[in-house]
């Protein structure tokens, strides 16, 4: 029988990495939305299923990436995303990615940012701070399971996601490797 659901392993080590809360006050006062800026320029992935949607915003797209005259995200206004709930899947899924072994991890570049490096008393594990992103990937019920598993001390955690989301996660990195 065919299924549209895939189970992937979750890196417990990654889920326990602490980040400062990604809230407007912290973004404006400290990090300035640095996660939206790539070290080598704008790298916002637009998936095939998203192209028409973002072209309606008047955005230029080339080879599955947003193209900008000033190399900045056109949706970033005053350090915040002006289309937060409607942003591209690649942005929604951040800071998460799949390793080469299909394990969900935190993307390496996020550990170079202030939200990770400069711990405060408000720092929390990434599965709490970026719960919204996890819900965009897996859905609320799966994330509720993740939290239950982590809090109960379970070591080997697997969550289900749609094939569509799985391939979108894979494509996020594939497109970036091609662009480099």
Question: Regions from the language model: what does each represent?
Answer:
Residues 1-180:
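Short loop/turn segments that flank or connect secondary-structure elements
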């Amino acid at each position: 029988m065919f299924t549209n659901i895939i189970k992937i392993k979750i890196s417990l080590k990654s889920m326990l990495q602490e980040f400062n809360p990604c809230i407007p006050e912290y973004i404006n006062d400290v990090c300035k939305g640095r996660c939206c800026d790539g070290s080598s320029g704008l790298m916002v992935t637009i998936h095939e299923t998203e192209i028409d949607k973002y072209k309606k915003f008047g955005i230029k797209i080339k080879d599955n990436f947003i193209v900008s005259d000033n190399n900045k995200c056109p949706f970033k206004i005053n350090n915040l995303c002006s289309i937060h709930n409607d942003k591209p899947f690649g942005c929604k899924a951040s800071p998460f990615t799949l390793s080469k072994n299909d394990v969900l991890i935190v993307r390496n570049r996020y550990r170079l940012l202030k939200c990770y490096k400069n711990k405060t008393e408000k720092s929390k594990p990434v599965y709490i701070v970026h719960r919204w992103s996890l819900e965009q990937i897996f859905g609320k019920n799966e994330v509720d399971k993740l939290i239950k598993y982590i809090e109960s001390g379970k070591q080997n955690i697997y969550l289900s996601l749609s094939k569509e989301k799985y391939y979108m996660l894979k494509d996020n990195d594939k497109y970036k490797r091609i662009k480099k």
